[in-house]
Amino acid sequence: MTAKPQLPERTPRVKGEPTALDGLLVVDFTRVVAGPACTQTLADFGAEVIKIENPDGGDDTRHYEHAEIGGESAAFLSLNRNKRGIALDFNNPAALEVARELIAKADVVVENFSGGIMKKFGLDYASVAATNPKLIYCSISAYGRKGEFALRPGFDPITQAESGFMSLNGFPDGEPVRTGPPIVDMATGMSACNAILLALIARDRLGRGQQVEVALIDTAMSMIGFYGMAYLISGANPGRIGNSPNGSPTVGVFQASDGPLYMACANDRLYRRLVVDVLDRPDLVTDPEFAHRKNRTANKEKLRAIIAGIFASDSLEHWMAKMKKANIPVGYLRTVEEGFNAPEVRDRHRLSRIPHPTAGAVPNIETPLQMSLTPTVDPVAAPLLGEHTREVLRKTLGYDERRIAALAEAGAFGKPGNTA
């Protein structure tokens, strides 16, 4: 039984170090996963990200039930670090005017509402581009902003299912399985971030902004990768293969006498080292049934049974030590708990704790991106709902206290009088 990780305080960055996106203003209308994942990366590297939420409950992920701390959900905390949060009721004309003023000042707008919502409120690209011609306007959706399916709602598992992505996940004798983590959402967020950065580079060269669009269905199809390319070339419909690509007898999960491991020996060189140096079975090299990759594939069930029987004869640590000595690609098959406590993770210093206004401190999982000259900003926990409304209106838009109070009284931030 492993222990809950002991999270250290996050080591501050060196004072005076530059950030990659310093001075970039991002107005963030996104919620749930793909959009917030995109804007969090921008915020991590120094962009000023202003997250706009509905005052009536805010981002859906605030109410996800995986876990909570200090009244905040794990999902929301994991996707909204380093942002400033404001609450605006779009049904209030005064709130819409605030949103338009923020867009007019922004370098980047990111939104992932259902089709037609931003247009309904006059906040779509066509409505705002004239007032800010250098604006990068990124729309994230399930099926795109144009075409027959533009108004159709959809989420990560729907696009996993409809793209064919889910059909490849699972075992041949079982049903298609969605991934546990929302992989299409996360990859769409990464793609949107890439697209925004490309558009910013183009703006520096061309002097004007543009509309950027990323759709979950497109991301899911691109992630099918060489399986999709193989289908287009051969016409053969790929199916589920479990843990071994093409049923390879030397790739996948194997059971030692006391636990599982995952091994990947996909070529002749690695196979020779495996059977000679690890399994002490040189006959599995000279036997013509197994001498080359094609032969091993043709006789995969027989070979896999032989290898599985050998692995079952000794302990996990015995085999891990031998395979690491032979430089065989192998890993422990861990739970999340085991993975987050593993030495490989501790060595990367990816986990820490950071201050939070209601919880005292919350866990922090660092971005996977590391840069030597422009590292990430010191992380700030995800905002409370509307936490920075007054601050943003005052510092970013130059509103005085009287104007802010009038907006609050008019219900621009939700119920009259509501403001941070």
Task: Describe every region a protein language model picked out.
Residues 1-205, 384, 390-420:
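N-terminal helix-loop segment corresponding to the beta1-alpha1 unit
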Residues 56, 143-144, 216-221, 258-260, ...:
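Glycine-rich beta-alpha junction loops
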Residues 67, 76, 241-246, 251-252, ...:
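Short Gly/Pro-enriched turn/cap motifs at secondary-structure boundaries
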Residues 145, 173-183, 204-220, 239-246, ...:
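Conserved Rossmann-fold dehydrogenase catalytic segment
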Residues 189-209, 222-234, 276-281:
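Oxidoreductase and adenylate-handling cofactor-binding alpha/beta cores
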Residues 249-326, 330:
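Aromatic-enriched alpha-helical interface/lid elements that frame and gate functional surfaces
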Residues 325-377:
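A glycine-rich dinucleotide-binding beta-alpha-beta segment and adjacent secondary-structure elements
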Residues 362-401:
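C-terminal active-site "lid" helix and adjoining low-complexity regulatory extension at the edge
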